[in-house]
From Swiss-Prot:
Belongs to the MurCDEF family. Its EC number is 6.3.2.9. It holds the Pfam family Mur_ligase_M. The keyword Protein biosynthesis does not apply. It is an enzyme of class 6 (ligase). It is found in: Cytoplasm. This is UDP-N-acetylmuramoylalanine--D-glutamate ligase. One of its GO terms (biological process) is peptidoglycan biosynthetic process.
Amino acid sequence: MDVAGKKVAVLGARRSGMAVAELLSLKGASVFVSELGTIGAHESARLQALRIPFEEGGHSDNVLCTDFCVISPGIPGRAPVVRAMLEKGIPLFSEIEVAYWFCKARIIGITGTDGKTTTATLVHRIFETDGMTHRYRAFSVGNIGQPFSSRVLTMRPEDVAVIELSSYQLEGCCTFRPDVSVITNITPDHLDRYEGELHNYAQTKYRIYAHQGKEDTLVYNDDDPLLHDHFASNRETLPCRIVPFGIGCKPEHAGFAAAVRFCDHRIVFDAGAKSENIIEAEDFLKRSFRGRHNIANALAAVAAARALGIGNEAIRSALQGFSGVEHRQEFVRTLDGSDWINDSKATNINALSQALETVPGRMVLIAGGRDKGSDYREIAGIVRKKVAALVAIGEAREKLCAAYGGMVDVRSANSLEEAVSLARALVEPGQTVLFSPGCSSFDMFEDFEDRGRQFKKLTTDLRS
């Protein structure tokens, strides 16, 4: 799209907002940045250097004098400024959509409730490995790494952009068309933003493939009940090539052009009547990368790589060297016979349940944060089976105590530091301390990364 001379309002002056404001300015647009909170000193200086006018502490009517608006993913559709723009008929786009207008590289878009970051990181490693041989670059952008807008102008046609996409980012995508789209799974999350309806949340996720054509590929998790049913009834209407992945030997995959599965302790790529063994389980599963969910992440990455013609050697090399992602069931230390695990990225109960299933043995669980409207009783079975004691923190601690009180030993802590101290006192040799909040972090921390770093520091500071 030609944006030269267009008036553009950018709502939000954090990383993606700053990046898209600079991109649009470089492309000749007249940009105005509006921030509800305070703009940092570095960001203010950068905007002034670029001669981009801005405001902070609220959104004035200036944002309504615009040809279109780029909206931060953190701003919900019910926000007054968004409603005012919609009433005036102002088009709203996400930073991802705008960056896509200027992208020359091949694109792999990855979304889902859980597993996005691990899958995106693994896909990036595969293409990074292959790129060293075939002389192209792989970029990791979007919800992971740097904003898409900050790197898009350096991307060449032979390069690959691996983009992790949240539902919030997909809301503002209208023409975005990845060469390969990946959906890792869909379970209830962020329902407070989607009127409490899983259907609304899922429909937003499906936007990732909405504009794909016959030359493109859609990869999805066929073990996910919602995705299985959705594509069983819709795949004949989609023009793109569809590649399911799943655990087990599945005869129903014979109807697809290709499929990736985990069968007989190895990853197998099926293409028609031909099957290829990609890698043995023992060559990629390890202490820092284990569990059914990580097998699924590896299957998704293999499917995405094969969709763009990557050979098995590069795939195997990347998988063998992959040791997981920070804050995802990350081993921190062993103290007095007990392992301490940081799973701060578990921001919903599905991720919490996966951690409980994956980490072996009994454990002391530290959980809680800002509740997303979850029903914690849904995972009562695995909690009863695996959790010896629960230390609840954050805004959700009373709800957690009510859900699991009488089922396990439940304690309440006013801070993460207190929770770590309680866990230290409760854990027995041979058990694990698992920090897997099952909630968002914004009640007590900047984000899940800040939360995870604080847990790791508190844990490493403990003395034997």
